[in-house]
Amino acid sequence: MTTVRTRIAPSPTGDPHVGTAYIALFNLCFARQHGGQFILRIEDTDQLRSTRESEQQIYDALRWLGIEWDEGPDVGGPHGPYRQSERGHIYKRYSDELVEKGHAFTCFCTPERLDAVRAEQMARKETPRYDGHCMHLPKDEVQRRLAAGESHVTRMKVPTEGVCVVPDMLRGDVEIPWDRMDMQVLMKADGLPTYFLANVVDDHLMGITHVLRGEEWLPSAPKLIKLYEYFGWEQPQLCYMPLLRNPDKSKLSKRKNPTSITFYERMGYLPQALLNYLGRMGWSMPDEREKFTLAEMIEHFDLSRVSLGGPIFDLEKLSWLNGQWIREQSVEEFAREVQKWALNPEYLMKIAPHVQGRVENFSQIAPLAGFFFSGGVPLDASLFEHKKLDPTQVRQVLQLVLWKLESLRQWEKERITGCIQAVAEHLQLKLRDVMPLMFPAITGHASSVSVLDAMEILGADLSRYRLRQALELLGGASKKETKEWEKIRDAIPG
């Protein structure tokens, strides 16, 4: 009997996302319920955004939640390497095989030509797609241009008519027309694979039997199925999990909800409570109980109990469930958890240099630095009264700063400062005009330790969360203002 093997393959390009933990949890439970194995693979082929720091954060966040894996970059295994950036020679071999078999071709089209083709197609109200320009180039011309070192990619061929039947473990057979599929790039000009080739090759070579992934990948499933067919490989069983959603039913995003696992750890949520809550996202225990452990979820796990309705990630419900876990702890357990959270040595070492020179005794630390140890901060609208800006301008500045910070990939003091500076300059303000708004939003006080240092220490999600709170207190942005301010945001450099 074949051993069940599932996997999670996150990209190390930012803070570890609760959506990653959600999919990892369901893959883990499915594997364990069937006596199988769970694999962690790192998709780091985006060399511009991938970092080893983000990779380590993924390991730390998943382990904090209690999710462990049998094979992976940090624990090894018989199917390594487990980082895609270290498997380039493998992908090249299989990409070349597809070209030799006539299932893929070398494309020399420049980005400028591709942009022009797309623009023409959109002007004709056609779906933008590759036009097949290089698909039938003579072999000798291809070889000559390759020998000359001309930039190129490898594209797969796809049918232009008919439908592809995608067998989904949750939905049954899903029919997707082939004319919706583009000739997907498999190998990029930098010699690294795209998601499609790498996932198919890795899943096959690593013996993955079941792929549980987010439903956002369902529309592109025909490309994966066709690649399995081209290689002559047995396709793993596919399961497209419903996406986590905001309370307004939109896709879960950092613009409306904190999405970083690190945020919930910093806020003082118990890992077992967060994992419990993620387990309730579209799934329920046979007896419908709301509170359960990972071991209990594994014992009773059944994919047939997954609901296709988009599960709502509601911060209030998570907080309620976390409270249930807290109240069931013994006093000793509670005290231990509080100590571990509040007196984290690594976190205290980040804060200490900014507090030490401002206090004369330890009792002054809490009033000065208490905001480092809370989720939200107490806000008073009077703190946002500004000598130079009217209330609408205050809201505009806070909204624009929030939007710019939401697009920030690396959360460092210099980059945070750059975002705020860019907003100020575009609005013809000075940095000193904007900073008095940042202090109360982030610290709850008109003055405190350096607010820029504080934002770096607090982290992206918690800082953005507090800015959202401040905006809500001041009335937020109307639909008309949002449209107007978005145009301003898009014109701000950086």
Swiss-Prot record:
DNA repair listed as a keyword: no
EC number: 6.1.1.17
Keywords tagged on the record: Aminoacyl-tRNA synthetase, ATP-binding, Cytoplasm, Ligase, Metal-binding, Nucleotide-binding, Protein biosynthesis, Zinc
Binding sites annotated in the UniProt record for Zn(2+): C107, C109, C134, H136
Catalytic reaction list: tRNA(Glu) + L-glutamate + ATP = L-glutamyl-tRNA(Glu) + AMP + diphosphate
Cofactor: record remark: Binds 1 zinc ion per subunit.
UniProt subcellular location: Cytoplasm
One Gene Ontology term from the biological process aspect of the record: glutamyl-tRNA aminoacylation
InterPro entries: aa-tRNA-synth_I_cd-bd, aa-tRNA-synth_I_codon-bd_sub2, aa-tRNA-synth_I_CS, aa_tRNA-synth_I_cd-bd_sf, Glu-tRNA-ligase_bac/mito, Glu/Gln-tRNA-synth, Glu/Gln-tRNA-synth_Ib_cat-dom, GluQ/Sye
Annotated motif 'HIGH' region, positions: 10-20
Entry superkingdom: Bacteria
Cofactor: Zn(2+)
Annotated residues for binding of ATP: K254
UniProt motif ('KMSKS' region) ranges: 251-255
GO molecular function terms attached to this record: ATP binding; glutamate-tRNA ligase activity; tRNA binding; zinc ion binding
Any one GO cellular component localisation term in the record: cytosol
Family listed: Belongs to the class-I aminoacyl-tRNA synthetase family. Glutamate--tRNA ligase type 1 subfamily.
Assembly information from the UniProt record: Monomer.
Function as written in the Swiss-Prot or TrEMBL entry: Catalyzes the attachment of glutamate to tRNA(Glu) in a two-step reaction: glutamate is first activated by ATP to form Glu-AMP and then transferred to the acceptor end of tRNA(Glu).
Protein name: Glutamate--tRNA ligase
Organism: Pseudomonas aeruginosa (strain UCBPP-PA14)
Lineage: Bacteria, Pseudomonadati, Pseudomonadota, Gammaproteobacteria, Pseudomonadales
